[in-house]
Amino acid sequence: MIDKTAFIHPSAIIEEGAVIGAGAHIGPFCYVGSQVEIGEGTVLKSHIVVNGLTKIGRDNQIYQFASIGEVNQDLKYAGEPTRVEIGDRNRIRESVTIHRGTAQGTGLTKVGNDNLLMVNVHVAHDCVVGNSCILANNATLAGHVEIDDHAIIGGMTAIHQFCIIGTHVMVGGCSGVAQDVPPFVIAQGNHATPFGVNAVGLKRRGFDKDEMQAIRNAYKILYRSEKTLDEAKTEIEALAKEQPVVQQFLDFFGRSTRGIIR
């Protein structure tokens, strides 16, 4: 179903069964598959392929040569009906690829709201990108990677399968991330190691002085005290009773399966 207020360029191909919302704009030489849903006000500039069981929300801007919802690159994939979901108000720049999930994973590759995916970013099968994230040019997420809200991934950075990047993290450019990066941390290098707290990012997002000091204290316990991880967790638990913002470290440790960068 194509809403009567949507614009479809004459050269675009919209397969029967696709849903195009009100005010959407499908530019020249785009292809939209039969199981695709595109929300209100979303713009496909030109030469874009959206395929498979893919749902795209409202007011997204998608630039030329992006490919969304295509078959993933997992060699075990056998055509299962896996999905891609993209939220609202994202900017997806030229030649970005976002692949559908796998039956062995969650079956879903998901991008949240208000993200910027710059040129040539790759989001592999079963990845989850949160809200208000920035993935710079040529950043590459392997399968099952999770990027939490407000994270920034530098250009030319590669992230290993199943890694988790915590909220408000900044990963420097040309890095290789092979383990999980706790919230609020700056990481860089190959393999990526911690380089302190993302103080500039936290200030921009309204963290107050007490919260920032608590985060710095937790960072020092984790990385500067020469404690084991279990010892650091115990000390951070005590700190979290006084400063709830530190609880985010503990919640992150509970999700980590690859170990954290040290």
From Swiss-Prot:
EC number per UniProt: 2.3.1.129
This protein's pathway: Glycolipid biosynthesis; lipid IV(A) biosynthesis; lipid IV(A) from (3R)-3-hydroxytetradecanoyl-[acyl-carrier-protein] and UDP-N-acetyl-alpha-D-glucosamine: step 1/6
One example of a Gene Ontology biological process annotation: lipid A biosynthetic process
Quaternary assembly: Homotrimer.
Protein name: Acyl-[acyl-carrier-protein]--UDP-N-acetylglucosamine O-acyltransferase
Organism, as annotated: Serratia proteamaculans (strain 568)
GO cellular component, one term: cytoplasm
Biological role stated in the UniProt entry: Involved in the biosynthesis of lipid A, a phosphorylated glycolipid that anchors the lipopolysaccharide to the outer membrane of the cell.
Lineage: Bacteria, Pseudomonadati, Pseudomonadota, Gammaproteobacteria, Enterobacterales
Gene name of the record: lpxA
Annotated localization: Cytoplasm
UniProt keyword rRNA processing, yes or no: no
PROSITE patterns (alphabetical): HEXAPEP_TRANSFERASES (PS00101)
Cystine pairs: none
Annotated transmembrane regions: none
Entry keyword set: Acyltransferase, Cytoplasm, Lipid A biosynthesis, Lipid biosynthesis, Lipid metabolism, Repeat, Transferase
Catalytic reaction equation(s): a (3R)-hydroxyacyl-[ACP] + UDP-N-acetyl-alpha-D-glucosamine = a UDP-3-O-[(3R)-3-hydroxyacyl]-N-acetyl-alpha-D-glucosamine + holo-[ACP]
Protein family per UniProt: Belongs to the transferase hexapeptide repeat family. LpxA subfamily.
PANTHER family: ACYL-[ACYL-CARRIER-PROTEIN]--UDP-N-ACETYLGLUCOSAMINE O-ACYLTRANSFERASE, ACYL-[ACYL-CARRIER-PROTEIN]--UDP-N-ACETYLGLUCOSAMINE O-ACYLTRANSFERASE, MITOCHONDRIAL-RELATED
Molecular function, one GO term: acyl-[acyl-carrier-protein]-UDP-N-acetylglucosamine O-acyltransferase activity
